[in-house]
Amino acid sequence: MSAELSQSPSSSPLFSLSGADIDRAAKRIAPVVTPTPLQPSDRLSAITGATVYLKREDLQTVRSYKLRGAYNLLVQLSDEELAAGVVCSSAGNHAQGFAYACRCLGVHGRVYVPAKTPKQKRDRIRYHGGEFIDLIVGGSTYDLAAAAALEDVERTGATLVPPFDDLRTIAGQGTIAVEVLGQLEDEPDLVVVPVGGGGCIAGITTYLAERTTNTAVLGVEPAGAAAMMAALAAGEPVTLDHVDQFVDGAAVNRAGTLTYAALAAAGDMVSLTTVDEGAVCTAMLDLYQNEGIIAEPAGALSVAGLLEADIEPGSTVVCLISGGNNDVSRYGEVLERSLVHLGLKHYFLVDFPQEPGALRRFLDDVLGPNDDITLFEYVKRNNRETGEALVGIELGSAADLDGLLARMRATDIHVEALEPGSPAYRYLL
C-alpha cells in the first residue's frame, strides 16, 4: 500500500515543524530514551503478504513512546521556567513519561489525575518520578483534572506540558521515525500508527514527508473515539459528544489544533481508518499468544488496523506498538470483547417454563456439540408460569451460529437474542 507525497506538513501556516527539528530532537533526547527494536513479524507478514515489522515502543523505558515528547519539551525550558515548576494532567502514559523526564532532569513537577485513576497507574507515576513528582487528584473526571492543572499554571506561573498539541512534544514523538529509517535498509512503503490526540502521527508524518520519497502513513483510531477523522471531515478540530473509553490511550474527544494542521497539510500521504474495540482486543490477544507482546489497547491499534487494511503484497510495512502499560485485571474484559468480535460469544434471554425438566430440554434440544454455556443467571418466581434467564453461549466456530438459532426457533421455549449495542448488552461488557 502506498501513496504519492503531497505537500509537506511543515507547509501549513499553523504547523512550523521540520525534519531537521526532529533530527535535533533525536540528539536531544538520546541520553534518556532507549532506541527500541524493529522486530520482524512472520505471522503478520504471512497474513498480509507484506514484510511487516513491529516498532516496539512497548519496550521503551516507561513502556510507551510518551517519554520522547515529554523529555524533548522539558529539556528545552529555561532555568527560570524549570524553577517555576512544570505541570501535566494525565492518568496514563503521558504522566509516566513526564514523571520520568522530571526525575532525569531533577525538576519538580505536578501531575493532576482524575479520582477514578487506578492505584496501579498512580503507583507507576510515583515510581517513575520519585521525589520529583507530586500526584494531585484534580476532580472526578479527566476534564476536571485538566482544568485543575490549568488553574495551577495560571496561579503559579508553572509550565504546562501537553500530551500532544505542542511542537516540542510532536518533535519528540517524531523521533520514532528517525529510528525506523535508521533501522531499515530501504524506506518503508507504509507506516501504521495509532491515533489519539495526534502527536505521534503528526511527528512521524512530518519526518517521513521530508526524508522519504514514497512512504505512506496509515493512522488507526478506535471506532468509538475517532476525533481526528471527525476533524479532517469537518475541516477543523471538533469535540465529540461521546467517547468510548476502552482504548484509553487513544480516547480523546478532540484532536489537537497543531496535530490536525499537520495531517490536513499532508494530503494524500496520510489516510485514516477506524477499528472497533473488539478487533483491538483480538489483536492484543494475538500479539500476546504469538509474539509474546503485552500490548495495551492503544498499543495494539496499529496491528488491528493493519489486518483490516488493503495491504499491497510485497510491500514493507512498519506497525507501531505504542505502549505496553496494560492492567492485567482487564484481560477478562479483553477476552470477552474479542470473543464477541469473532462471533464466538452470544447472549440470550431465555423464558423458561417454571416446570421440571425445562432446563434439560433446552440443553438437549438447543445446544450443539461444540456449544458451551458460559453464563447462566436465573431466579425462580413461584407466582409466574415462566422465568427469564440470562444465558451466555460460546460457540466452537462462528459458523455454528446459524444452527444454534435454527434450533432455538424450533423449540417451544421463547428465546430472545441480545443485540450488541443494546443497553442490556452494554451492561455485560
Curated annotation (Swiss-Prot):
Give the ACT-like domain ranges: 346-420
Q: Where does pyridoxal 5'-phosphate bind?
A: N93, G196, G197, G198, G199, C200, S322
Record PTM N-acetylserine, positions in chain: S2
Q: In which pathway does it act?
A: Amino-acid biosynthesis; L-isoleucine biosynthesis; 2-oxobutanoate from L-threonine: step 1/1
Is the Amino-acid biosynthesis keyword given for this protein? yes
- What's the Enzyme Commission number for this chain? 4.3.1.19
Q: A GO CC term? A: plasma membrane
Q: Answer whether the UniProt record assigns the keyword Nuclease to this protein.
A: no
Cited PROSITE patterns: ACT_LIKE (PS51672), DEHYDRATASE_SER_THR (PS00165)
Family stated for the protein in its record: Belongs to the serine/threonine dehydratase family.
Give the PANTHER family listed for this entry: THREONINE DEHYDRATASE, MITOCHONDRIAL, THREONINE DEHYDRATASE, MITOCHONDRIAL-RELATED
Entry-linked NCBIfam families: PRK08639.1, THD1
**How does the annotation summarize its subunit structure?**
Homotetramer.
What protein is this chain from?
L-threonine dehydratase biosynthetic IlvA
Give the species this sequence originates from.
Mycobacterium tuberculosis (strain ATCC 25618 / H37Rv)
Which gene codes for it?
A: ilvA
